[in-house]
UniProtKB/Swiss-Prot annotation:
Its EC number is 3.1.-.-. One of its GO terms (biological process) is rRNA 5'-end processing. CDD domains: YqgF. This is Putative pre-16S rRNA nuclease. The keyword NAD does not apply. GO terms for molecular function: nuclease activity.
Length: 147
């Protein structure tokens, strides 16, 4: 089954998806929406579920904390609220697991990868959330591949 990762912000959400074996993470979309319109994000997730024939069994949500001490910040509470929305949205889908994955440094890693690939700054801005979702998903997959 596939895993879907989200790098959620207030106006954009990066999406990444795994292959059926849960080994390879690929960037899927950099979804832009009205500020804090999380119903649009839920609708996008539903669209992805349909496009992938409901082969997704896990949603991996990037979990932001303070870089140095791991304490919660404003974005952490935003993600926790969205997590509750996701749980409610998928209440009748027992097969879908929703999990957090530490996203500290994911944007830096994604940006550095893009720079190393000679991607121009304007393009980096357009795809960095999607690539951050890839980093988040890779982290999750590396820890959970045999579970």
């Amino acid at each position: 089954m596939r895993k879907l990762a989200l790098d959620l912000g207030t106006k954009s959400c990066g999406f990444a998806i795994s292959d059926l074996l849960g080994i390879i993470a690929s960037g899927l979309d950099n979804f832009i929406y009205e500020e804090n319109d999380f119903t649009a994000v839920l609708a996008k997730i539903d669209e992805i579920m349909i496009n992938y024939h409901h082969e997704i069994d896990t949603i991996v949500l990037g979990y932001p904390t303070n870089v140095y001490d791991g304490s919660k910040n404003e974005r952490t509470y935003l993600i926790e609220s969205f997590y509750a929305l996701l749980k409610q949205h998928f209440l009748n889908h027992e097969k879908i697991k929703i999990v957090y994955e530490d996203e500290r440094f994911s944007t830096k890693i994604a940006t550095q990868r893009l720079k190393n690939s000679c991607v121009k700054a304007a393009k980096i801005k357009k795809v960095k959330d999607k690539m951050s979702a890839v980093v988040i998903l890779e982290s999750y997959l590396s820890k959970n591949h045999f579970n």
